[in-house]
From Swiss-Prot:
One Pfam family it belongs to: Ribosomal_L25p
GO cellular component assignments: cytosolic large ribosomal subunit
Keyword annotations of the record: Ribonucleoprotein, Ribosomal protein, RNA-binding, rRNA-binding
CDD domains: Ribosomal_L25_TL5_CTC (cd00495)
MF annotations from Gene Ontology: 5S rRNA binding; structural constituent of ribosome
Lineage, highest ranks first: Bacteria, Bacillati, Bacillota, Bacillota incertae sedis, Caldicellulosiruptorales
Coiled coil spans: none
Protein name as catalogued: Large ribosomal subunit protein bL25
Gene Ontology biological-process annotations: translation
Alphabetical list of PANTHER family matching this protein: RIBOSOMAL PROTEIN L25/GLN-TRNA SYNTHETASE, ANTI-CODON-BINDING DOMAIN-CONTAINING PROTEIN (PTHR33284), RIBOSOMAL PROTEIN L25_GLN-TRNA SYNTHETASE, ANTI-CODON-BINDING DOMAIN-CONTAINING PROTEIN (PTHR33284:SF1)
Quaternary assembly: Part of the 50S ribosomal subunit; part of the 5S rRNA/L5/L18/L25 subcomplex. Contacts the 5S rRNA. Binds to the 5S rRNA independently of L5 and L18.
Amino acid sequence: MEPVLVYNRRDIFTKSNLNKLRKEGYIPAVAYGDDIKSLPGYVSKKEFEKLYHQKGLAGKIKISIDGKERTALIKEVQTHYTKGNIIHVDFQILSENKPIYVEVPIIFENAEILKSRGLVLQRQMDTVEIEGLPKDIPEHLVIDLMAYEKPTAIKLKDIKLPEGIKITEDLDEVVAVIDVSEITEEPEVEEKKEETSSNA
C-alpha cells in the first residue's frame, strides 16, 4: 500500500512560527492546484524525507488534506544555503482527468555491456519533459542499451514510452552518444620500460 503524507493546514505565518515548526520536526509547505489556489501548511520532516528519497523532485505521491487523499507532485524543494537541510516544500495537487507536464529522469539500463563491445556511453541529457494524465506518469523513462552494438546517436524518438505518455521536446534531440572507447597505449609503455632496462 502506498504511503500517504499528512498535510496540516497552517494559519500563522510569522518567521518565528516557521522556525518553531522546523524545531518540532516539521517542514513548512504550500499546496496548490486547480481547486486549491494556495494552501499554506506543514508536513512531517521524517515522513517527507523518506518519500523524497524514494521519489525525488517531481515525484508523484499521495497526500492527505483535511482527511481527503489527493495525488500530488513534489514540485519544489528549498534547502538551507549552508546547512543543506530542507526548509520548505511546494506540492502541486493533480486533477486525475487533466494532463500534466513534468520532468522525469532518463535511466540507461545495461550500460556495462557497452564496455565488452569496446564502446562508451556519453550522456547528453539526464531528464526530459513529458505530458500525460497523472495516473500514467512514470517515475522515469528507460533506455535499454543491450541492443546497441556499434557507435550511434540515441535520440528522444528512440525512447519507448508508456501508453498515454508523450515527450514535449524536440524528438530529434540527442539523449546520448555511443562511441568507440579510447585505446590505451599500455603495451608501448611496457616496451619502453624494457628498452630502458636494457640500456642500463
